[in-house]
Amino acid sequence: MADAGARRPFFRRRKTCPFTGSNAPKIDFKDSKLLMRYVSERGKIVPSRITAVSALKQRELARAIKRARFLGLLPYVIR
C-alpha cells in the first residue's frame, strides 16, 4: 500500500494566449475596456509572462496601448 501522506504532484496548466482562437477579441486601440485589463493599477503594461499573451500579440497589445495613451483614451499614469 502506498504512503497515506503521499500526494500526487501538482501540475500547473499551461496558459494559452487569449488573443488566439476562433472567437478571440481583436486588439484595437479604441477598445479601452479590453486594453485596461493589460495595464497594471499603476499604469504600466503587464508583461506577457503574467498574462500569457504570445510574443506577437504582446507587441500588438503594447502598440495599441501606446496609441490609446497618445490619443487620450488611456491614462499614462494612474494615481
UniProtKB/Swiss-Prot annotation:
UniProt record, GO biological process: translation
UniProt similarity note: Belongs to the bacterial ribosomal protein bS18 family.
Pfam families: Ribosomal_S18
PANTHER family cross-referenced by the UniProt entry: 30S RIBOSOMAL PROTEIN S18, SMALL RIBOSOMAL SUBUNIT PROTEIN BS18M
GO molecular function: small ribosomal subunit rRNA binding; structural constituent of ribosome
Quaternary assembly: Part of the 30S ribosomal subunit. Forms a tight heterodimer with protein bS6.
Free-text function comment from the UniProt entry: Binds as a heterodimer with protein bS6 to the central domain of the 16S rRNA, where it helps stabilize the platform of the 30S subunit.
NCBIfam families: S18
Signal peptide bounds: none
The entry's keywords: Ribonucleoprotein, Ribosomal protein, RNA-binding, rRNA-binding
Name used for this protein in its record: Small ribosomal subunit protein bS18
SUPFAM superfamilies per UniProt: Ribosomal protein S18
Any one annotated GO CC term: cytosolic small ribosomal subunit
